[in-house]
Amino acid sequence: VAIAENSVVGGTCVIRGCVPKLTLTGDDTEPLIVDALLCATGRTTQSNIFAVGDCTDR
């Protein structure tokens, strides 16, 4: 998992980075959004990771 940058916006932690395709959808990579608290503590798992569009960190 390559995470380039983390930021909290409007109570939502936006992780700018990519993950293997098997983690989310059939695409090669996906950007992630996780709960702000989970982001702060670094506790991110597949169950709380959501794809938000095309990954720009290829």
Swiss-Prot record:
Disulphide-bridged cysteine pairs: C13-C18
One GO MF term: glutathione-disulfide reductase (NADPH) activity
Xref: InterPro entries: Pyr_OxRdtase_I_AS
Source species, domain of life: Bacteria
Function in brief: Catalyzes the reduction of glutathione disulfide (GSSG) to reduced glutathione (GSH). Constitutes the major mechanism to maintain a high GSH:GSSG ratio in the cytosol.
Requisite cofactors: FAD
Keyword annotations: Cytoplasm, Disulfide bond, FAD, Flavoprotein, NADP, Oxidoreductase, Redox-active center
Protein name: Glutathione reductase
EC number(s) reported in the record: 1.8.1.7
GO cellular component entries: cytoplasm
Annotated catalysed reactions: 2 glutathione + NADP(+) = glutathione disulfide + NADPH + H(+)
Extra information: The active site is a redox-active disulfide bond.
Quaternary organization: Homodimer.
List of residues binding FAD: E5, T12, C13, K21
Sequence similarity: Belongs to the class-I pyridine nucleotide-disulfide oxidoreductase family.
Subcellular location: Cytoplasm
Note describing how the cofactor binds: Binds 1 FAD per subunit.
